[in-house]
Amino acid sequence: MRFLRSLGLLLWSMPWLCAAQQPAADAAQQGPAGDRTLTEEQRQSLIDRLTALLDEEGRRIGDFTAGGAGFRLADTDFGTLNFSIWAYARYLNQKNLDETYTDSFGRTKTLDLRNDLQLNKVNLYFKGWIYDPKFSYMFFVWTQNAQMGDGSQVVLGGGLDYSFKPQLNVGAGVTQNPGTRSLRGTFPFWHRVDTRLIADEYHRPSYTTGFYVYGNLESNLQYKVVLGNNLSQLGVNAVQLDAEFNTFSASLNWSPQGDYGARGGWGDFEEHEELVTNFGLGLTQSREDRQSQPGESTIENSQIRLSDGTRLFEDNAFNTGGRVNKATYKMLSLDAGVKRHGFDVSGAYYVRVVDDFETEGFIPVDQLHDWGWQIQVSKMVVPKKLQVYLGYSKIFGEYGDPHDQVAGINWYPFEERLLRLNTELMYLKNSPVGYPSVPMLVGGNGTVFMTSLEMVF
């Protein structure tokens, strides 16, 4: 390792190891019996022994593992500690969006269009095991710098896991409700930088705190089950939560050929020689109330909305003077993908039902039923260097049918998957989703340009 070699060179430069280079007169004064000079061969042998000893005792401290594992800070008989960072800088231009939009109830709102550069997110990860390799931990500091100065800028979280065997792992802490593919551990191996198509963003759950069970079953089948506090807890304090603890989310992911690329993500960066496929299923159900909803600017904000972007739990949501206090969210997602020779074609279907309302005043409906789909296609036009991609999604809702289209390029200057320059043009039609850390705005109509430099180690 580099640092061990450097340490060996440092020791070599110390005077007691360099005595052989003293003037011959000094050596003669000591006489044969007191001569402590080392020959070149003896000195090199000592350096080799010290380096071998340090390599054994220091283990793998300082090692770097690509793919998000980061740098090894500690490796002892009592545990390990790895440190990694995910961050990106983004230039965002929304000036070509319409300045106002009108929702399905005739209410006109003015949009705050952006044209700025942000170090949009910086996430710090600390992970390893302690006392027993089966008992692992992961803690993170998660920042949203587009909200700099607000209470929602920084989130601290993590989880504690125990592995009984590959088929059975249990844990508690902050985790994804794995309702869609983008919440099944694929991040950050996406075509886009920290951005979903609007059909995924609209239907999906988010992060919760709870218990979870996961594992790898036979025939390359993976599962995860979560029982948590709510659909989206980041930015929600414990006092706001109801006392039900009834959010349930589960997923199955099947890669028949066994290797679908890093974390089962999008894009065929690996250039598979043979056809590989992936299939997924997500189920989520949660009883939600208006007290337990995150703010509009919260990290990984996931609000239950009407398809025109109106938040279900806001006052006068349906323009009748009434409001919804509680509702039950149920969502199903199905997805499939195929990769070969640098090509990736992936699609997903979503259906969401929100019902069992508890209301104050008059609400004109007793349930919401929306569905949508998306497709993404990409090609590595220069292996390990340059990728192009296209995406389209559409939502079919009771209060509008929004859609979006994207075209983008990823350039990998060092031929490493997790350091890239991304440039993208996006078209929005009546976007029902948006918050500061993503490029969409609620009600957005028109084009958005962005370019991002992403780094993960």
Which role fits each region the language model picked out?
Residues F248-D259, G443-F457:
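Outer-membrane beta-barrel "beta-signal"
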Residues G70-N96, T100, K109-Q233, Q240-D259, ...:
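Outer membrane beta-barrel
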Residues A66-G68, S104-T110, V193-L197, E314-G321, ...:
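Extracytoplasmic loops and strand-loop junctions of Gram-negative outer membrane beta-barrel proteins
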Residues M1-R5:
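Positively charged n-region of N-terminal signal peptides that target proteins for export
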Residues N253-W254, A262-W266, E271-F396, F457:
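Detector for outer-membrane/organellar transmembrane beta-barrel domains
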